[in-house]
A protein has these predicted regions:
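Catalytic loop of short-chain dehydrogenase/reductase
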Residues: 2, 8-33, 38-39, 43-46, ...
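Short beta-strand segments at enzyme active-site cores
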Residues: 7-11, 52-55
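C-terminal helical subdomain
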Residues: 47-62, 68-110
Length: 110
């Protein structure tokens, strides 16, 4: 990436990296550190044409093992919607780079 002065690095965080929660200190510590790493890398690599972004995934993700409850259709994140967010970040023009993005299900409080 450095020789080409182009590239994208995406780091996946969680809401625990933005807000501390009871009984989550070890997890939060790692996610807070990841967010700090993303911010430092973004400032270091931005002048060299490399886009670094931190994505906060704030909610559960639907899967075959964890289907969306029929009575709560918007309670879990759709993995395809998350993938679309990552793809959008990869394709962003340099004139409008995002440094941090939060994705959460529609019913999630913030």
């Amino acid at each position: 990436m450095l020789p080409k002065k182009a590239g994208v690095i995406l780091l996946t965080g969680a809401s625990a990296g933005v807000n501390g929660y009871p009984q989550s200190a070890p997890f939060a510590m790692g996610k807070f550190a990841l967010r700090g790493l993303a911010q430092s890398m973004a400032r270091e690599l931005h002048p060299q044409g490399i886009h670094v972004a931190h994505i906060v995934v704030d909610g559960g993700i639907s899967s075959a093992r964890r289907p969306v409850p029929p009575d709560k259709p918007d309670s879990l994140l759709d993995p395809n919607a998350i993938a679309d967010t990552y793809l959008h970040l990869i394709r962003q023009p340099r004139s409008a780079w995002s440094w941090e993005v939060e994705v959460r299900p529609w019913v999630e409080h913030f």
